[in-house]
Amino acid sequence: MPTTCLNFTKKCGGCPLLAMPYREQLAQKQARLQELLGGFAPVKAVQGMADPLHYRNKAIASFAAQHGKLVCGLYAEGTHKVLPGADCLLQEDILNKTLAAVLDAARTCRWTAYDEDRGTGLLRHTVLRSSADGKVLVTLVTPGPELPGSKNFCAAMRKKAPWVVSIVQNINPTRTSAVLGNREKTLYGPGFVLDMLCGTQFAISSRSFYQVNRTQTEVLYKKALELAKLTGRETVVDAYCGIGTIGLCAAPQAKQVIGVERNPAAVKDAA
């Protein structure tokens, strides 16, 4: 696999296996599966991707102040040192473009980065979610509800990144490594992005669990449904269902689907 990422040599914590040939990565996964499951049943070959790059539909970046300037990016491995955002080889291209627009707009608003040691500053993280048709949900994580200039930020984003369909402020006052808090305010748009998976449309919000590899998720779900051999008479229980991707994809082939989930935000998205 290519190692042209500018941050790879700086020990970015995002993809430590980038330098390993993809076939070797698959071989290691195969060996691990054989070790874990081989004693119970035959383990078939791992089905890899045709192009294992730019597949992630979710990006999380942290903000920091470096040399008096606001930056954002991933942490260096094993640290909380932010590596300013180079174009990530795993994220969808639209997310790299959106991240650059978020940083530019935040600088225009003269927002400051949150300092986790002092507990001061405004921006902690940004979380981006993208759809198959190139639409993006932007979430800004702040330590408190104050976000002065948020209207100017939204206006700037609509100009710089017109593919952004919604902007949400997530409030996380805890001094922990958790990215998202439990409170949110929608600043622009519906508060979610719509995506298609196996022919079914899903609403994805910032706190919803959603598979980050859309391509391989469809491969996995279609194979699972093929092996399930549903006849239309079954009741399918989708335990820990999140926004219900498995159950809703199975619904056309089953009598009924029951989803079980404790996260209210995920249940709202599934509905």
Regions found by a protein language model. Give the residues of each.
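SAM-dependent transferase fold signal centered on methyltransferase-like domains
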Residues: 1-185, 197, 226-233
